[in-house]
A protein has these predicted regions:
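Disorder-to-helix initiation segments
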Residues: 1-13, 36
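Acidic/histidine-rich alpha-helical segments that form the ligand environment
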Residues: 10-24, 77-124
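Short, charged, amphipathic alpha-helical segments
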Residues: 11, 37-45, 69, 101, ...
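Helix-loop segments that flank and shape redox-cofactor active sites
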Residues: 19-41, 63, 113-116
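A structural signal for long alpha-helical coiled-coils and helix-turn connectors
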Residues: 25-32, 55, 59-62, 83, ...
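Conserved alpha-helical segments that form or flank metal/cofactor-binding pockets of metalloenzymes
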Residues: 37-78
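Preference for long, well-ordered alpha-helical segments
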Residues: 103-172
Length: 172
């Protein structure tokens, strides 16, 4: 039973990584030629390394990848793109802000994965096969980078037109 739980948990996180990578590939295409595309490309490369770590861990634990979960994740990302496109058809700051927020939340989930596996490894010797502290630190560094960029974009995306108009009316 516990092995089934580990398989389910790891496959859920693998599916989440599919969503993240697809989202980043789309962002790179949408914002091609802009500095944010380079930021996303570097982040995607880092996350793909983590996906490989997760796949290697699953392989060592003899856990098969769930094609159903991966397909569902792919479909979820397509619906996410539709939602983002409807929210901001001009591919502006709102779309970028919401995408960065989704990535930030996903990276936090990955950090939680590594923390949970480290805790489980204390009582399950078969899980003592990865450097969870290093992986957690990588996730924290990625999250910090994404959060800094997300908050930068938030200043533009969530800027109130009323506050801008009020300042211009008052002569500021």
């Amino acid at each position: 039973m516990a092995d089934d739980h580990i398989a389910t948990y790891l496959n859920d996180h693998l599916a989440g990584s599919v969503v993240a990578v697809e989202l980043m590939e789309n962002l790179e295409a949408v914002y091609a030629g802009k500095p944010i595309a380079d930021f996303i490309a570097k982040l995607r490369a880092d996350i793909e390394v983590d996906v490989q770590e997760l796949e290697n861990l699953m392989g060592r634990l003899q856990i098969s990848e769930s094609r159903t979960r991966k397909a569902s994740a792919w479909l979820t990302e397509k619906f996410t793109q539709l939602k983002l496109r409807l929210d901001d058809p001009a591919h502006g700051d709102l779309r970028l802000f919401e995408s960065l927020e989704a990535l930030s939340l996903g990276i936090e989930g990955k950090r939680s994965l590594w923390l949970a596996l480290a805790a489980a490894a204390e009582v399950s010797p078969q899980l003592r096969i990865a450097d969870y502290q290093r992986l957690r630190q990588r996730a924290e560094e990625q999250r910090d980078r994404v959060e800094a960029k997300r908050l930068e974009v938030a200043q533009r995306a969530l800027k109130s037109e009323r506050s801008t108009q009020a300042k211009s009316s008052s002569g500021e």
